[in-house]
A protein has these predicted regions:
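Conserved active-site and SAM-binding loop architecture
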Residues: 1-184
Length: 184
C-alpha cells in the first residue's frame, strides 16, 4: 500500500508502516528525525500522487483549543489553518486519518470520529488526540496501561517544546500501521 504521512517530521508513523512492508513516505516542511523515505516540502504538492492511505498531522498551533486565550489575535491564521485541514480532508485519497489535539476543527468543520489517549496504546500518559477518519475503522486499543501522567502538558517552556508535544506516540503509530495497514 502507498502511504502518505503528511506533516510528520518525526518519522514515527512512516516507519511503523514501512516496517510492515508498505511504501510509506513522510512529507513535512522540516527534515525528518529518522532516516527513511521523506520529502522536505509542502504536502499539498503531493496530494494527487496516487496514495492509498494518508495519515495527516496538520500543525496545531492555530487550531488547538489549548491556545484559546490567543484566538482573538489570530483569526487570519486560524482561517488559513482550517483551509489547510480542508485541503487534507478533501484530498483524492481513498483512506484518510487526520489527527489533532482537541481543536477548532470540531466546531468549524466536524466532530472527530474518535478520541484516543496514549495510555490506550502502552504509554502511561494522557494527551487527548482526535481522529477524523475517511473509510477507516476506529483504532482499537492495543495495550491499556495504568498511570495517567500529564507529561506533555507539564513540559516547561523551551524552544523545542512544540516538537516534543507534536511527536506521535510509537504505540499509536504501531496501532495505525497494524490496524489500518492490514485493512488494505
Amino acid at each position: 500500500m502507498r502511504v502518505l504521512v503528511a506533516c510528520e517530521f518525526s518519522g514515527r508513523v512512516r516507519e511503523a508502516f514501512s516496517k510492515r512492508g508498505h511504501d510509506a513516505w513522510s512529507i513535512d516542511l522540516l527534515p525528518s528525525e529518522l532516516q527513511g523515505q521523506h520529502v522536505q516540502g509542502d504536502v499539498r504538492d503531493f496530494l494527487d500522487d496516487n496514495w492509498d492511505l494518508m495519515i495527516a498531522h496538520p500543525p496545531c498551533t492555530h487550531l488547538a483549543v489549548s491556545g484559546a486565550r490567543w484566538f482573538k489575535d489570530k483569526l487570519e491564521e486560524q482561517k488559513n489553518a482550517l483551509w489547510f485541514v480542508l485541503n487534507l480532508m478533501d484530498a483524492p485519497i481513498p483512506k484518510i486519518a487526520l489527527e489533532n489535539p482537541i481543536s477548532i476543527i470540531s466546531s468549524h468543520i466536524r466532530k472527530p470520529d474518535q478520541i484516543v489517549q496514549p495510555w490506550m496504546f502502552g504509554h502511561p500518559e494522557t494527551k487527548a488526540t482526535c481522529l477524523w477518519l475517511k473509510n477507516l475503522p476506529k483504532l482499537e486499543p492495543t495495550n491499556i496501561v495504568e498511570g495517567r501522567e500529564q507529561r506533555v502538558w507539564k513540559m516547561t517552556p523551551s524552544p523545542t517544546r512544540w516538537m516534543e508535544r507534536s511527536r506521535t506516540y510509537t504505540g499509536i503509530a504501531d496501532a495505525m500501521a497494524e490496524q489500518w495497514g492490514a485493512k488494505s
